[in-house]
Amino acid sequence: MNAPDKLPPETRQPVSGYLWGALAVLTCPCHLPILAAVLAGTTAGAFLGEHWGVAALALTGLFVLAVTRLLRAFRGGS
């Protein structure tokens, strides 16, 4: 219907901001125990259980990146 390249730039920025916000919520390090419970019994869950510190560090980095991009998207920066 509406291709992303045909949307005006001011419409595209909030959409990307919401996507970065969703990623920030999912990768928040405080959600790591919930993520471990959801992934229990899977290969990702086994990796998470064995490498708790690495997972926390990676999720923290991704969380900081997502929050930074979220703030830039809603402030109108690039």
UniProtKB/Swiss-Prot annotation:
Protein location: Cell inner membrane
Molecular functions per Gene Ontology: mercury ion transmembrane transporter activity
The keyword Repeat appears for this protein: no
UniProt key word Membrane: yes
Bilayer topology: Multi-pass membrane protein
Source species: Shigella flexneri
Cellular component annotations (GO), alphabetically ordered: plasma membrane
Highest taxon, organism lineage: Bacteria
Coiled coil: none
Coarse class of the protein's main subcellular location: membrane
Transmembrane domains' residue ranges: 19-39, 47-67
Main function: Broad mercury transporter that mediates the transport of both CH(3)Hg(I) and Hg(II) across the membrane.
Pfam families the UniProt entry points to: MerE (PF05052)
Protein name listed in UniProt: Broad mercury transporter MerE
Keywords: Cell inner membrane, Cell membrane, Membrane, Mercuric resistance, Plasmid, Transmembrane, Transmembrane helix, Transport
Taxon lineage: Bacteria, Pseudomonadati, Pseudomonadota, Gammaproteobacteria, Enterobacterales
